[in-house]
Amino acid sequence: MSIVIQNVSKSFGSFQALADINLSIETGELVALLGPSGSGKTSLLRIIAGLEAADQGDIYFHKDKVTQTHAASRQVGFVFQHYALFPHMTVADNISYGLRVKPRKERPSKKEIAEKVRELLALVKLEGMDDRYPAQLSGGQRQRIALARALAVEPKVLLLDEPFGALDAKVRKDLRKWLRKLHNEFQVTSVFVTHDQEEALDVSDRVVVMNQGKIEQVGSPDEVYEQPKSPFVYDFLGNVNVFTGRVKQGFVQLDKHQLKTPTISKDIHDQEAVVYTRPHHMEISRKKQKDAIPAVIEHIHMVGPIAFLELNWKDDEEVLQVELAKDRFHELDLKKGETVFVVPKNLTLFFPEEFTI
């Protein structure tokens, strides 16, 4: 079931949550709506579900306009962040709830419902837990039961609102892998909301990056990370080093230093610009070389296989972040307080008019 979002806008009083949103989601896709708090991602999800009405614009499921269709008639499965399981019902009763409240003519038999529950418990790897209550389950198990309940009614579309947000980091990572595998097996069109960049990049087929009620970029996880189209996307998807200077025929002038910039800048003779690069795209050397910036190591900390360094440059006014593989760090034998030479690589160029305030 494909989803088409056409010119959708939504305001809450004077606050504009969504501004002229257009988006197409293909049948069987798993799409992440990624953005900071207040970016409009949950409002968009609720409008797709029919839980909120858009001020303008339309929603289509396949070719059917569902803008005015009640949420109960949209055949949508919705999974909330905090499970929303019925505490007084067993696991089996929670999963089967949507089936048991169907109109009598549409309701499966008790035998069919019991069989469906068994199938779904097997699907979410929780066989034998039919008679347990939510309080007897871990957070990860509760969320899997919530997902099984959403799938029980065989929805055309599955919507998930920060489904792993209430769980600890290890459980979140395990459930991400499980959700990706489950989606590959089930192939239901799915949209999930998250503010977790790693989660969006790890799980989804495509990422929709949102900011201030607008879509900044849509693309595969690799596309949005490696080819960000705006400063916001670049900054939101990970740590970044920022250099401000003037571009002149292939180089950006940073006070006393020059950086070679992407080929797009060769035709620019003298224009203010901002250069972005990731900490893992920073090379460190003990020898001065072309495009190198002298900097003093101020802080070093190790996290697993990565060494994270903070260096001062430009008369101690600005900090550079560098990430090195632990082996490379030990090979260089770097020490706090020493001066090294940093060469930024994989530079992305933005101009002042591209920044969103």
Swiss-Prot record:
It comes from the Bacteria. It is found in: Cell membrane. The keyword Secreted does not apply. Residues 3-237 form the ABC transporter domain. It is a peripheral membrane protein. It catalyses: sulfate(out) + ATP + H2O = sulfate(in) + ADP + phosphate + H(+); thiosulfate(out) + ATP + H2O = thiosulfate(in) + ADP + phosphate + H(+). ATP binds at G35, P36, S37, G38, S39, G40, K41, T42. Its main location: membrane. One of its GO terms (cellular component) is ATP-binding cassette (ABC) transporter complex. PROSITE patterns: ABC_TRANSPORTER_1, ABC_TRANSPORTER_2, CYSA. The keyword Cell cycle does not apply. Its EC number is 7.3.2.3. It is an enzyme of class 7 (translocase). Keywords: ATP-binding, Cell membrane, Membrane, Nucleotide-binding, Sulfate transport, Translocase, Transport. One of its GO terms (molecular function) is ABC-type sulfate transporter activity. Pfam families: ABC_tran, CysA_C_terminal, TOBE_3. Signal peptide: none annotated. PANTHER family: SPERMIDINE/PUTRESCINE IMPORT ATP-BINDING PROTEIN POTA (PTHR42781), SPERMIDINE_PUTRESCINE IMPORT ATP-BINDING PROTEIN POTA (PTHR42781:SF4). Part of the ABC transporter complex CysAWTP involved in sulfate/thiosulfate import. Responsible for energy coupling to the transport system. The complex is composed of two ATP-binding proteins (CysA), two transmembrane proteins (CysT and CysW) and a solute-binding protein (CysP). Belongs to the ABC transporter superfamily. Sulfate/tungstate importer (TC 3.A.1.6) family. This is Sulfate/thiosulfate import ATP-binding protein CysA. The lineage of its organism: Bacteria, Bacillati, Bacillota, Bacilli, Bacillales.
